[in-house]
């Protein structure tokens, strides 16, 4: 092992390095402060609609603290499944504003999965109205695409939409 004297390290060099590190740290802090998102100010609540399968969701979004009111209930009460909760919060997390808005939603029709998908679409559409700059990121993530898949109708003469009774040649 070599001693600091042998490495030709003086206190002046150490102080110079410390000053450079401190200056870099100040620059990083300033960049982070500039990068933090400005608070949202809206003159009126944003209202949007989302649809998926048979579900229709109307969303009213206002600046707030991240509260969800779904048919008068909290997000955890209405959607006990964590997968649905993550699906719904995904657009807010993507634009880094998970606790910037209060969301009041009226959901009807369909089941939990369809309602969760419809709510995600409605929230993504509302975010675009608030900050149009987020559109490319939301589009790339696929949050603005209406999922057109729905149950195919049953046809007469068949048991289900496409299932037929077994064919007998003779």
Swiss-Prot record:
It comes from Rhodococcus erythropolis (strain PR4 / NBRC 100887). This is Small ribosomal subunit protein uS9. The keyword Chaperone does not apply. GO terms for cellular component: cytoplasm; small ribosomal subunit. Belongs to the universal ribosomal protein uS9 family. The keyword Ribosomal protein applies. Disulfide bonds: none annotated. PANTHER family: RIBOSOMAL PROTEIN S9, SMALL RIBOSOMAL SUBUNIT PROTEIN US9M. Gene3D superfamilies: 3.30.230.10. InterPro entries: Ribosomal_Su5_D2-typ_SF (IPR020568), Ribosomal_uS9 (IPR000754), Ribosomal_uS9_bac/plastid (IPR023035), Ribosomal_uS9_CS (IPR020574), Ribsml_uS5_D2-typ_fold_subgr (IPR014721). GO terms for molecular function: RNA binding; structural constituent of ribosome. It comes from the Bacteria. Keywords: Ribonucleoprotein, Ribosomal protein. The gene is rpsI. GO terms for biological process: translation. Pfam families: Ribosomal_S9.
């Amino acid at each position: 092992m070599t001693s600091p004297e042998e490495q030709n390290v003086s206190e002046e060099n150490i102080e110079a390095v410390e000053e450079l590190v401190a200056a870099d740290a100040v620059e990083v802090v300033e960049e982070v402060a500039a990068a933090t998102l400005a608070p949202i100010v809206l003159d009126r609540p944003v209202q949007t609609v989302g649809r998926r399968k048979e579900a229709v969701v109307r969303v009213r979004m206002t600046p707030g603290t991240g509260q969800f009111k779904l048919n008068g209930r909290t997000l955890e009460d209405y959607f006990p499944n964590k997968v649905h909760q993550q699906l719904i919060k995904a657009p807010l997390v993507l634009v880094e504003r998970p606790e910037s808005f209060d969301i009041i939603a009226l959901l009807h029709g369909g089941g939990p999965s369809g309602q969760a998908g419809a709510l995600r679409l409605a929230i993504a559409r509302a975010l675009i109205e608030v900050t149009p700059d987020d559109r490319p990121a939301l589009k790339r993530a696929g949050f603005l695409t209406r999922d057109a898949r729905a149950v195919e109708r049953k046809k007469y003469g068949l048991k289900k939409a496409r299932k037929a009774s077994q064919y007998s040649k003779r």
